[in-house]
Amino acid sequence: FEEGLIKNFWNNKEDYELIEFAIKNHNKIKIEETNNERYLAFAKLIRDADKIDIYRVLKPFLGPTDGTGCSPDFVDLFVAGKQCDYTKMRTQDDRKLVRLMWVYDVYFAWSLQQIVEQNYIEDIINNLVQDEKMMQGITRLRNYIQEKLQTKDIWQG
C-alpha cells in the first residue's frame, strides 16, 4: 500500500479503501474500530482466509514435540480460551499452541469448518504434550469448535 501499486487494480476509491482496510487489518491483534459493516465483514473474511492459508502452509512442517514444551503463560491463556502476545513465543510448542488459540479468532463458521475438515487442529493437538492442564484447554477448544460450527454466518441469514 505504501507504494500505491494496488491502485492499479481499482478505479473506484470506495473499493480501494475497503481493500486497504481489510488488508491492513489482516494480521493485527484486533481489527481497527469502524462503523462500516462492509469494511468489517471484508476484514474478517481476509483474516480468516489468512489463517486458513497459514495452517495449510505450515502443515507439512508440523512435527512431534521437541521436548521443550509450552510456556506456562501460554498454556494458562489456552485453558482460558484467550489469545496471546506472539512476541513472547519461546518454544516450537508455543508456536503450535498459538495456532490452536487462533481458533478463538476465526470469525466465520464456514472458515472454521474448512480448518476442521483439513484436520489442522487435530494434527497440532497430536503433536503437543497432552498433560492434564493441556487437556483442559483442548477440551475447551473442542467444545468451542462444536458451538461455533452450529452458528450461521452473515450471508446465511
Residue ranges and their predicted role:
Residues 13-22, 38-45:
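Alpha-helical scaffolds flanking conserved acidic
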Residues 9:
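Ligand-binding beta-strand-loop-alpha-helix segment within the catalytic cores
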Residues 5-6, 28-157:
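Divalent metal-dependent phosphate-bond-processing catalytic cores, especially two-metal-ion Mg2+/Mn2+ enzymes
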Residues 1, 17-29:
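His-Asp-centered metal-binding catalytic motifs of divalent-metal-dependent phosphohydrolases/nucleases
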Residues 12-13, 93:
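Alpha-helix N-cap/helix-initiation sites
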